[in-house]
Regions:
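Glycine/proline-enriched, intrinsically flexible loops and inter-domain linkers
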Residues: 1-272, 276, 280
Length: 284
């Protein structure tokens, strides 16, 4: 799992870009004492000419090329959910989120099946926008992703943008040994599509926990599932992890978009954290 190109370390590439220009960076690209936990979303204070500000811009992205190749509808919907979840994981809110899409598809060549791919993707993204009340206000598209017999996978990358206060931003590396860690996830239907009422309940619960200062670190589960989340959260401070429950391989590696792995602050009552699907207590 860790060796997958979508999951493995991209530190060498990331460090080619200067993340400190303007001295407004809130979250560096890698967190923790050892700077090995990748940050899922960008957070930087807005530049001002005079004085100081704590107003912080946040931006996260979402895209699963494998899911999109199987079903552009599922892929686009999940991209929107993933991008917004990453914003929430570091302290944002979905109610103050705006989207921009980057779309890239094969040449349609007047083929109804090929035309169906961008149509399906746009319907999936539209469904997510309507359900969450987050509109896409910009983007860039191309329908030239074909070279001879090679086509790009159906591509709709979602970027979610929001604002928060710098003091509310949460980084993603585990902070200390002995913390309680929970998994909160929404419900999904028989077609593996997220239940949006359940998803909004999850989003609101995570936002409330962060706003109340009850979260030490938070990770929006994405392509690599819970296993990716736990591994990368552990790297930054070299804190190990032990599961209290036995998880199946499917539960460990399944990409459940809209789910969160959360390290709780000391003294948080787990019985008060309840949504439609029971939380799963895990421990460091």
């Amino acid at each position: 799992m860790i060796s997958n190109l979508n999951i493995c370390s991209q530190k060498g590439l990331i460090e080619r870009f200067d993340s400190t220009i303007g001295a407004n960076t809130v979250l560096m690209p890698f967190g923790g004492k050892y700077q090995n936990t990748p940050t899922q979303a960008m957070a930087a204070k807005l530049p001002v000419l005079h004085g100081n500000t704590k107003t912080t811009s946040i931006m996260g992205w979402g895209y699963d090329p494998y899911l999109s190749s199987v079903s552009p509808y599922h892929g686009a919907m999940s991209a929107v959910v993933e991008s917004i979840a990453k914003v929430i994981a570091i302290g944002g809110t979905y109610e103050k989120c705006w989207l921009t899409f980057q779309e890239y598809f094969e040449r349609t060549q007047n083929d109804p099946e090929r035309w169906g791919k961008p149509m399906s993707a746009l319907l999936g993204a539209y469904k997510a926008q309507i359900e969450l009340g987050c509109g896409s206000i910009g983007g860039k598209d191309s329908m030239s992703g074909t070279f001879e017999e090679i086509d790009v996978p159906p591509t709709l990358v979602s970027f979610a943008v929001s604002v928060t206060d710098a003091d509310k931003v949460v980084s993603q590396e585990f902070k200390k040994a002995g913390s309680k860690v929970i998994l909160i996830k929404p419900e999904y239907d028989d077609n593996k599509l997220v239940n949006f009422d359940s998803l909004k309940a999850v989003f609101e619960k995570v936002e409330k926990l962060i706003a109340e200062g009850k979260v030490l670190s938070c990770w929006a589960v994405s392509y690599g599932g819970v296993s990716e989340a736990v591994a990368k959260m552990a790297f930054g401070n070299k804190i190990g992890f032990k599961f209290t429950d036995k998880l199946t391989a499917e539960e460990l590696y399944r990409a459940c978009y809209g789910a969160f792995v959360i390290e709780l602050a000391e003294g948080v009552d787990l019985s008060l954290i309840h949504i439609s699907e029971p939380t799963r207590p895990l421990y460091i």
